[in-house]
Amino acid sequence: MSDQIRASGYFYSQTDDPFAAAFWSQFQDPHVLAARHIPADSSASAAMKAYREYRDRVRKPVLATYTILGFLSSGTYGRVYKARLRTPPQLASSSGTAGIANANAGTGSGTATVGSGASTAKKRGGLLQQHQLLDSPSSSLHATPKSVADGAGVGVNGTPSASPSLSASLGTSTANAPGGSDNTLQLSSNELPDTQIYAIKKFKPDSKETDATIYTGISQSAMREISLNRELSHVNIVTLHQVMLEDKAIYMVFEYAEHDLLQIIHYHSTALRAPIPLAVLKSLLWQLINGVAYLHANWILHRDLKPANILVTSQGVVKIGDLGLARLYSSPLQSLYNGDKVVVTIWYRAPELLLGARHYTTAIDMWSVGCIWGELLALRPMFKGEEAKMDPKTKAAPFQTDQLKRIVEVLGTPNKDRWPAIESMPDYKGWWPHLRLDNYPKTLSRWYATRNKGDDGYELFNSLLQYDPEQRLTANQALEHAWFTAQDPKPTANAFSSLAKPHATYPNRRVIQDDMDPKMKSNYVPPIKSHHMQPWHQVNLNSSQPHRLAQLMYQQEQMRHQQMQTQAPAPAPAQPPAATAVTGRLGHAVGAGSSAVGTAANVGGPAAPPPIAIGSTAGTGGAIGIQSSAASTAPSQHMYNNNPLITIAGTNGGTISNPATVRSSHSIGSTESITPTTSSQPIPAQPSSAPLARTTNLVATATRNQQRKRQRN
C-alpha cells in the first residue's frame, strides 16, 4: 500500500494518521472494502446500488473541509461561494509523532486535500508549464519566451532586464513584469494573503426539463474547466486546488481573488468618478496579456475574455478565470463552430465571429483584450450593442446587426483594403446592404486621445482592434511592444503598487450572507461521520487522551447494536473466555511496558482479519500496530464479523476484557477523557454480553443496516 495521500479519503499515510493507515493497509483496493458491505445473495443491480451507496457515504462532504463565508455570484453554470478552510481543534499535545504534531500546524499547506496555496502547484498531464513552452504552431502564433512566461522583464529589443522577485505569496519567483526594481513593490511578510480563503464554484448538474428531474451527467462547461485548470500552472491563471463531488453536484475549489476588473471599473466610475491611473492600467494589461500568451502557447483559446472573468488579488496580481468556454485547438475532434456556435460575450466578440466565421484563431482573444483596454479607459463598454436573442425553436445564431453597427461607428466601415477576406465571411452578403447605406469614417484615434489624455499606447491599442484577424498583434508581440518595455511608467508585478498609501487597494468583494441554498449557508453544520474526520480529530495518541480512539469505537459499537436490536435482534453464541485471549471485541490486552501487543486468540466463531492494537508505553503515550489473530475454521455467518479487532494495551500489565469499562462519549467532539488502569493486579475477565461480543465496525455501519432493511422490505 502506497503512503500517498489521496483526496478521495480512502488512503492515508502512516505519518498523518497511523490508525487509518493501519486499517486501510489490510485492503489492496478500496473497492474490496466496499464489496464487504454488499450482501452475498444480492443481485448484480442490488450489489452495484449498495456499492455506490457505500462509495458516496465515505466520500468526504464539502462542508467537512470548508466553512462557507457567504455567496459571491451566480451564473448559468451555478453559484460561487467564499469559503475558509476549516481549522482543526487544537488538542492537548506533548511529544507526539511527527505526523500528528505536524497535522495541526500544516492545515493551510494543503498537502492533503486542497493542494498548496502557491500558484505553481504541480500539474498532471501533457500541457506545458511556464518553463516548457513549445514553438509556434504557425507563423502568426509564437510561443511565449521563457523570460515572458516566467515574468522576467523584457527590455528594449527583447533583451531580458533584471526584475526583483515577486512575493512569496504567489509561490514563485518568476512572476515579475518588466521594469526596474524601482517600479516593483516588494511585499512584506505581513502583507501575505490568507491562503486558507478559497472560492468554491458549485456547478448545477445537467437535467432534463421535465416534471421529474433526470440527471444526465456533467456539463460540458464543467468538464472543460476541470480538465484545463488541472493542467495549467501560471502566475496569471487562476489555480484550481480541488474538485469535489457531492449530491450530484460538482464543487471546484479555486484560489480566492478579492477583486476583478469589472469591480475596479465600477468603483472608478461611481465612487471615485476618476479614470484608472495609467500605472495601474498598464500593469493590469501587461499581466492580462501575459496570461493570454501562456494559454495560446499551450494551444488554448479562452473564448470568453471580459472584465468579470479577469480576477485580481489583493496583491495586484491578475488571474484569468472561467475557462468554461476555453478549448484546445491543436487537434480538435470537430470544428470549432460545430462545438460551440456562439462564443465570447457579445460586447467583446470579434468581427469575424459576428460575421459567422466557421474557423477562427487566437486573434479573437486579442480583440477581446483590446475591448477590455477600451473599457478600462472609458469606464464603460467600448462597443455596447444590443444582443439579438436566439430563436429557441431553430437554435440558430441570429445576426448581431446592432453590435456590428457599434463597432463600425468607431472603427469605420470595413472594405477589402482593410480586410481582404471580408467577402468570404458567411454572413457578409446579408450585412452588405446596411454597409452601403452607412459609410462611417474611422474615429478610433480621437476616441483614444479624449480618454487617455494623449497618444501614448495608441499604436498598440489600434493593432489589437484591427478588422482583419491576420493583422492583429499576437500576445507575445504585444508584450514586446515599446509601450510596455520602453515608456514610463513600467508595468509592475503588483498592479496596485502605485496607489496612494496606506489604502493601496480597492474595496473588498461583496459577500452576501443570505443565500437561497440552506446547505451552503455559513451557519450550516454538516453531519460529519467518523470516517470523514481529519486525523487530528480522530485521535491524538500522545496527548492527554490516549484512549480517545477506544472511546469513539465503543460509542460506535453501542449505536450499532442499538439499531440491530431494534431491527432484527438475534442472539449470538457467547465465546468462552481465555486467560490470554481477548473475549470481548473491545478490551485490554497485556502490554507490560511495550507498545507491541501479544497475540489474541479468537476462540470459536468466524474468522476475522488481524486486530488493531493500541499500545501504551508511558501511561499517556500510545502506538498503533496490527495484531495477528488465530484463524478460525468456522465459516463467516455475518459480513460484519470480518472486521479487525481492537485491543488496548495497558502500562502495568492490566488486562481488561469487559468493554463496558471504557466509557463512551455523547459527542465526537467531547473533551471527556478515560483514565487508564494503573493497578498492578490483573483485573479478572468478565463474561461479555452477546451484543457486545460482536465485531467493532470501523466504518459507519448504521447505513449498511438500513440498506439491509430496505432489501428485506
Curated annotation (Swiss-Prot):
The lineage of its organism: Eukaryota, Fungi, Dikarya, Basidiomycota, Ustilaginomycotina. Keywords: Activator, ATP-binding, Kinase, Magnesium, Metal-binding, Nucleotide-binding, Nucleus, Repressor, Serine/threonine-protein kinase, Transcription, Transcription regulation, Transferase. ATP binds at residues 72-80, 201. Belongs to the protein kinase superfamily. CMGC Ser/Thr protein kinase family. CDC2/CDKX subfamily. It holds the Pfam family Pkinase. Coiled coil: none annotated. Component of the srb8-11 complex. The srb8-11 complex is a regulatory module of the Mediator complex which is itself dependent transcription. The srb8-11 complex may be involved in the transcriptional repression of a subset of genes regulated by Mediator. It may inhibit the association of the Mediator complex with RNA polymerase II to form the holoenzyme complex. The srb8-11 complex phosphorylates the C-terminal domain (CTD) of the largest subunit of RNA polymerase II. Its cofactor is Mg(2+). It catalyses: L-seryl-[protein] + ATP = O-phospho-L-seryl-[protein] + ADP + H(+); L-threonyl-[protein] + ATP = O-phospho-L-threonyl-[protein] + ADP + H(+); [DNA-directed RNA polymerase] + ATP = phospho-[DNA-directed RNA polymerase] + ADP + H(+). This is Serine/threonine-protein kinase SSN3.
